[in-house]
Amino acid sequence: ITDGWLSSEAQGRRSIYRYSESGAKRDRLAQPRVYQNANDLWDGEWHVVVANNWSSDPELYAQYVRDLMWSGFGKISENVFIRPRVSDKSVCCCRELAESISPTSICFTAETARCVSQEPLVDLIKRTWDLDTIKSRYEVFIDRYEPLLAAVWKNPRLPGAQAFAIRLFMMHDFRRIRLVDPMLPPALLPDSWSGDQAFYVAHELYDLLIPSSEQYVMEYMQG
């Protein structure tokens, strides 16, 4: 609720929680980032958004910035945002991001010149996205859940409540990292990137926990 993801409604002594309007929008943006891995080839093209922040309400502009970040954009100046163009190129980024950018923003594509040194590009990546911190968070995730994955492989028939709890906390931890990971294509990532291994651990553990945890949820809902 504090972060604006949920809204609550009192019904007697109970409180009913559901996605807020902004929370539902953020969840739609997050879905492909959480459940898909970035393995696209990149040909040097970028999406660029230039925001007219001087004509926007500050609170609304802050929300636009957060939504752009959750869509993989990095901030290279106060009102200019970029991300590698690796999705369906038949879809205009303005149409894809209709809910995320200000109506007064300008969206276009650009291309990295191949005749210049790659050093400025490497420096730009480092200044735009904090990949070292994200990599460290992935490594913490792997250290925490890889042993669990090995244990569940040996004994996949966990009690339903235990399987549900592990699945819930694991996906919560993984989602928090994916929301700040720009999902850059491999060509722009540092060596020994830990995101792929973290995705593998999360994907495998999730699949192993599905049968027991889903059965537990169905039994709980049926009373």
Name each region found by the language model:
Residues 41-50, 74-79:
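Glycine-rich, often proline-containing surface loops adjacent to acidic residues and nearby aromatics
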Residues 113-223:
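C-terminal regulatory/effector modules of DNA-binding transcriptional regulators
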Residues 10-16:
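Short, Lys/Arg-rich nucleic-acid/phosphate-binding segment
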Residues 22-47:
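Short, amphipathic alpha-helical interaction segments positioned at domain boundaries
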Residues 3, 29-36, 63-67:
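Short amphipathic beta-strand starts and helix->beta connectors
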Residues 54-152:
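Mid-protein regulatory/catalytic core that forms ligand/cofactor-binding pockets
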